[in-house]
From Swiss-Prot:
The protein's name in its UniProt record: Phytol kinase
EC number(s) stated in the UniProt entry for this protein: 2.7.1.182
Signal peptide: none
Organism from which the protein derives: Synechocystis sp. (strain ATCC 27184 / PCC 6803 / Kazusa)
InterPro entries given in the database record: Dgk1-like
Origin: domain of life: Bacteria
Keywords assigned by UniProt, alphabetized: Cell membrane, Kinase, Membrane, Nucleotide-binding, Transferase, Transmembrane, Transmembrane helix
Amino acid sequence: MGIEQNNPMALPLWIAVGLAATYLGAVVLTAELLNRLSLSPAEVTRKIVHIGAGQVVLIAWWLSIPGWVGAIAGVFAAGIAVLSYRLPILPSLESVGRHSYGTLFYALSIGLLVGGFFSLGLPIFAAIGILVMAWGDGLAALVGQRWGRHRYQVFGFRKSWEGTLTMVLASFLVTVVFLSYTFGFTVIVLVVAGTVAIASAGLESFSRWGIDNLTVPLGSALIAWAGSYLWLG
């Protein structure tokens, strides 16, 4: 079931890592500039980082960056997140109106998924988990805040059905795209993607401490892997 990680550009590792780091730096810098210049609401700048940072998995996949590099990078990013909680060095990473360790969990989830699935030769499942979190959760938050009219509560956290539906749709589309790329577009792919989407929305509904930034990517990646192994492999 593995996918060959061929580097089409045959770049040395240090250049590949440098390109990925440059991309992440550009994402954070853009968000910081928007935040410091007050050109966009604080929550929007956070979601720019949230969505933008997740795309690094595609760069790592395309450039065949080894899993161990991703694991180390995840630990390094987690360290920066912890430091940013102590010192206001990157306000664009801070949660708005709530105490959260979401950035820390997000960095750890990327490190775990890239380190694990890339090392197994299964980068597609790392991509699914990370991009479900990036696009699903990121868009759900923005849609819920802007257009959320129908509210409900889960363990004291207010959610909107509009945001939850966005999470389901984005997660479904991400999973369908990547599974279809690998296994072809089939009914089973739709079933697996639907399972991932519903489970991801359920995991996202419990977001105390920002733990959904860990449970959503790990859960969606593992469900996609298990479903593919059982029904598509």
